[in-house]
């Protein structure tokens, strides 16, 4: 990724695993934030070794976990409805990157999608296998001859180290007129500005990149994708605010988190700066 006119934006703490501090550097050319220092590929897996890393488990121990799992079940249907609206054919194919425990692919498979998935975490792959969803560890294990109608990344792009290279790979794996769907946090949302360094969606150092709408569109258009639309993830502001309250105060202040999450969504009705956004791109 090219860098120019970089300046310090925030210092954030890893509240999930290490307790280490990381700098967020603003790149004005790309209109994104970059986590510094970025862990090496060898060190990165250790920052995911936590029972709190919910996307690699099906656990529902804490209230926030139960909230996450409950919302996830609602969103699975909405996600499949979205991909069905984009592709109208008998032999439709889907590749999900960072497939976690395979629930999205399982739901899509039930709606007659031919599904493939990539998930580096072995425990998550094992849980997916129990649902009869077989995932590969790395995208390099997907044959270049395989082509897909949709490639999806649900809160995954921000985790990928070699960003430009991987986006080129997605482009090559898509069918002509195929779609790339990306969901990521939005650092220009109200809840991000309210919580500042305590905003849970910064999630350093697992989140290596932090996107604005302008930055995301600029990045993907530079890789021969055509921007189609954004869609809001309205539940994210509540879940992220709940975690952020815990980081900021040490307490789970449900009422305060609800108020901040609601205010973020109400402001976003005017600005479209939701806590997280789904981007739909078409292969050019």
Predicted ranges, named:
Residues 2-8, 213-231, 256:
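A SAM-dependent methyltransferase catalytic signature shared across enzymes that methylate proteins
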Residues 182-209, 214-219, 242-246:
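Short, glycine-/aromatic-enriched active-site segment of Class I SAM-dependent methyltransferases
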Residues 164-179:
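A short glycine-rich, Lys/Arg-flanked "PGG" loop and its adjoining helix->strand segment in the class I
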Residues 161-165, 192:
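Short N-terminal helix/helix-N-cap motif within the alpha/beta-hydrolase-1
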Residues 228-256:
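Conserved catalytic loop of SAM-dependent methyltransferase domains
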Residues 154-161, 183, 206:
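Short catalytic micro-motifs in class I SAM-dependent methyltransferases
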Residues 1-154, 164-167, 232-233, 244-245, ...:
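Conserved N-terminal segment of class I S-adenosyl-L-methionine
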């Amino acid at each position: 990724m090219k860098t120019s006119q970089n300046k310090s934006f925030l210092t954030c703490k890893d509240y999930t695993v290490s307790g280490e501090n990381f700098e967020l550097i603003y790149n004005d050319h790309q209109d994104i934030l970059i986590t510094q220092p970025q862990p090496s590929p060898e060190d990165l897996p250790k920052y995911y070794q936590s029972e709190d890393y919910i996307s690699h488990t099906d656990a529902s121990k804490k209230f926030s976990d139960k909230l996450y799992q409950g919302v996830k079940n609602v969103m699975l249907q909405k996600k499949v409805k979205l991909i069905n609206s984009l592709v109208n054919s008998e032999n439709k194919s889907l590749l999900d990157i960072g497939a976690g425990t395979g629930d999205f692919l399982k739901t899509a498979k039930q709606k007659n999608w031919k599904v493939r998935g990539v998930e580096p975490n072995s425990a998550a792959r094992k849980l997916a296998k129990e649902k009869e969803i077989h995932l590969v560890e790395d995208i390099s294990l997907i044959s270049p001859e395989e082509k897909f109608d949709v490639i999806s990344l649900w809160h995954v792009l921000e985790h990928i180290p070699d960003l430009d290279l991987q986006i080129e790979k997605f482009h090559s794996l898509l069918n002509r007129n195929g779609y790339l769907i990306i969901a990521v946090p939005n650092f220009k949302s109200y809840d991000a500005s309210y919580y500042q360094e305590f905003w849970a969606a910064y999630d350093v150092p697992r989140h290596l990149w932090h996107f604005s709408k302008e930055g995301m569109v600029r990045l993907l258009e530079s890789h021969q994708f055509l921007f189609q639309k954004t869609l809001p993830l309205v539940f994210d502001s509540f879940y992220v605010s709940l975690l952020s309250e815990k980081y900021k105060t040490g307490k789970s202040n449900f009422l305060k988190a609800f108020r901040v999450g609601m205010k973020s969504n109400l402001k976003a009705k005017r600005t479209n700066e939701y806590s997280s956004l789904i981007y739909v791109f078409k292969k050019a």
